[in-house]
Structure formats: structure tokens, C-alpha cells
Amino acid sequence: RGRGLHNKARELVNILCESFIEMTPNREHNYCCGAGGGVINCGPPWKGTRMVNSREKKAQIERTGAEVLIAPCHNCHSGLEDIVEHYGVDMEIKFFGDIIYEVMEKTIYQEKK
């Protein structure tokens, strides 16, 4: 996040998606999903605390008005999924890799005879 690695991903999302809506604030100032560094794997005792601390992230997500939320990694996907479920946010969460896969040209493999 802090080294600008997501800039290339943003370029791709802008190319691949019809209407990309950036969260505000964004980039290195974006609010954390609360699952960073694998914190989500600390388990149920910490989930309640994570959800209380995720209220602003929930509001940030809702302000976009988007239908789909793109998660850059598995930890973020799980953290965002928890937020969406806990607060009843009507939004689908997809992995960035799934977005790429959806728009890829696919050929069906057929064994040569």
C-alpha cells in the first residue's frame, strides 16, 4: 500500500471495468479493512473488536455506491466480507484476480489426436 504497488492494479481496473469508483480517501490514506497482516486469523475473540473498529470502513464502502468491491488479497477479502456481512452492506466482493479472469479470452483445451 505504501510503496505504490497498487497503482498498476488501478490502471488495470480502469481498463477492465466499465465504471471504476475510487474510495475516498484512497491509496496510502485508505482505511484498513482490519484484516491486515493476517490479523483476521486471530479468530472469533477479536472479530467483535474488528467490527467495531470497521465502522468507518463500512461508511467509506457505502459512500462509493458501487455494486462490487474489489479485494486485492485474501486477508482483505475476508476482512471486507466480515464487514459487509456484519453491517448488512448490499455489495458483492470479488478478488482482483477474478476480475481479470472474467474478462480473459478463454479457449477450451482439446487434446490433439
Where are these regions (language model features)?
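Iron-sulfur cluster-binding electron-transfer modules in prokaryotic oxidoreductases
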Residues: 1-113
